[in-house]
């Protein structure tokens, strides 16, 4: 009888694969979308730029004066490139277009780069949040009700024009350019995110541990495709694949053709 495989243990969200909450500062999100932002603007001051373990982008600790009560509210925004401690941040419909300010996306001109874009009005930030990422505004509808943006992946998406966005690029760009160098650095990187590392291949395991394990040499021994209706312990490999192989005209096929030509 086989064991419970790695994919099944991950899905249970137990302590082994659950990311640690200790050391985390706060959720990186906008203010609650209130009357002050919908009709005018509100000013905040960046108290500090902080690092949160497990997050690549730095966070800006912004203090806002509550427009309805005599107190100060503290929010944590994803910092834009060029922001600094003591800088004023303006959020709202009538805010100026400057790096770090938060505006409805239909108020920002075409061609502007933005980050931390909302997908739905008031969801407090969804797209382009990783360090060095940005989205580009392609165009607006005539009534300003819809806006089309290009995401960091190159995909284009249409979102409501009232969704908020930060002008500029997310700070911390070039983070992935620095080499890891040591396995210890890689270990601590994945330990913070609670991802299994190093990742053992299924064909290198015993048959009791994985459907691809076992044999006198490392091979799967049967088609890698598996039905979407298969049991949880069988769902490894190419799950519910519509097709297999290289995509004709794709980047991987072109690289394979170049390698074959160079070998000739």
UniProtKB/Swiss-Prot annotation:
Origin, by domain of life? Eukaryota
Q: Which PROSITE patterns match?
A: RIBOSOMAL_L2 (PS00467)
**Keywords in alphabetical order:** Cytoplasm, Ribonucleoprotein, Ribosomal protein, RNA-binding, rRNA-binding
Any Gene Ontology biological process: cytoplasmic translation
Which SMART domains does the entry mention?
Ribosomal_L2, Ribosomal_L2_C
> Which cellular component terms (GO) are annotated to the entry?
cytosolic large ribosomal subunit
Q: Where in the cell is it found?
A: Cytoplasm
Q: List the disulfide bonds.
A: none
Q: What Pfam families does the annotation carry?
A: Ribosomal_L2 (PF00181), Ribosomal_L2_C (PF03947)
The family annotation for this protein states:
Belongs to the universal ribosomal protein uL2 family.
Q: What name appears for this protein in its UniProt entry? A: Large ribosomal subunit protein uL2
Q: Which gene encodes it?
A: RPL8
């Amino acid at each position: 009888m086989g064991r419970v495989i790695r994919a099944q243990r991950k899905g249970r969200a137990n302590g082994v694969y659950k990311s640690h909450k200790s050391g985390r500062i706060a959720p990186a999100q906008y203010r609650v979308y209130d009357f002050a932002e919908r009709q005018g603007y509100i000013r905040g001051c960046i108290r500090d730029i902080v690092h949160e373990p497990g997050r690549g982008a730095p966070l800006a600790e912004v203090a806002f004066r509550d427009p309805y009560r005599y107190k100060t509210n503290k929010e944590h925004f994803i910092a834009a490139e060029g922001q600094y401690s003591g800088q004023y941040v303006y959020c709202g419909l009538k805010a100026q277009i400057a790096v770090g300010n938060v505006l409805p996306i239909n108020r920002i001109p075409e061609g502007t780069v933005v980050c931390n874009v909302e997908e739905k009005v008031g969801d407090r930030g969804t797209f382009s949040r990783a360090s060095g990422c940005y989205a580009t505004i392609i165009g607006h509808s005539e009534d300003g009700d819809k806006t089309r943006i290009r995401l960091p992946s190159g995909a284009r998406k249409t979102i409501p024009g009232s969704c908020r966005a930060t002008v500029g690029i997310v700070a911390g760009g070039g983070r992935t350019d620095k080499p890891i160098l040591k396995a210890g650095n890689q270990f601590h990187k994945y330990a913070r995110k609670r991802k299994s590392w190093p990742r053992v291949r299924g064909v290198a395991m015993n048959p009791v541990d994985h459907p691809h394990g076992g044999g006198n040499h490392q091979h799967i021994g049967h088609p890698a495709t598996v039905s979407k209706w298969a049991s949880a312990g069988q769902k490894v490999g190419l799950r519910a694949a519509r097709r297999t192989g290289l995509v004709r005209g794709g980047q991987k096929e072109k690289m394979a053709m170049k390698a074959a030509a160079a070998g000739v």
